[in-house]
């Protein structure tokens, strides 16, 4: 999807929803919390790097709102897919961590596995945050 502007994103979202309809689908599943960040305006999580290439940078519009509008205008339902624990999957995703990412704000809540960084659900405060 093209996040360069709201109009470009809306055009991509419309094409996606039209394709879903042509396939006979009635529900679209959208990942909205990929790396401890969000593809929607949030007071708890920084903007996803998938929006602008930089985690924490506001794209100037709410991608989830656009997706919801385009889905609902076609009679499609939309379900949000949330990764509640994954904060980073490798040395390159996301490349730069926003200062308000949980890796920075609560380093005592994280654990690592391979190249991944995760919120540790065994820590009560981290589990409550989710």
Language-model segments: which ranges?
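Active-site-adjacent "subsite" loops/lids of carbohydrate-active enzymes
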Residues: 1-10, 79-80, 85-130
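Aromatic/hydrophobic pocket-lining residues that form the small-molecule binding cavity
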Residues: 9, 13, 60, 64, ...
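Catalytic domains of carbohydrate-active enzymes, especially glycoside hydrolases
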Residues: 11-38
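Hydrophobic transmembrane alpha-helix bundles
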Residues: 15, 19, 65-71, 115-126
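Aromatic-lined substrate-binding rim segments of carbohydrate-active enzymes
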Residues: 16-17, 34-83
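Conserved, mostly hydrophobic/aromatic
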Residues: 20, 28, 71, 78, ...
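Glycine-rich loops and low-complexity Gly/Arg-rich segments
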Residues: 23-24, 52-56, 103-106
């Amino acid at each position: 999807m093209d996040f360069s502007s709201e109009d470009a994103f809306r055009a991509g979202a419309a094409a996606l929803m039209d394709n879903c309809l042509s396939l006979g689908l009635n529900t679209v599943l959208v990942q909205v919390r990929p790396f401890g960040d969000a593809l929607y305006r949030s007071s708890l999580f920084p903007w996803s790097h998938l929006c602008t290439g930089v985690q924490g940078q506001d794209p100037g519009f709410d991608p989830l709102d656009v997706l919801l509008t385009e889905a609902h205008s076609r009679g499609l339902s939309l379900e949000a897919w949330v990764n509640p624990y994954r904060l980073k999957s490798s040395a390159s995703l996301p490349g730069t961590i926003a200062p308000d990412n949980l890796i920075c704000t609560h380093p005592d809540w994280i654990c690592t596995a391979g190249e991944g960084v995760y919120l540790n659900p065994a820590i009560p405060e981290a589990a409550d945050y989710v």
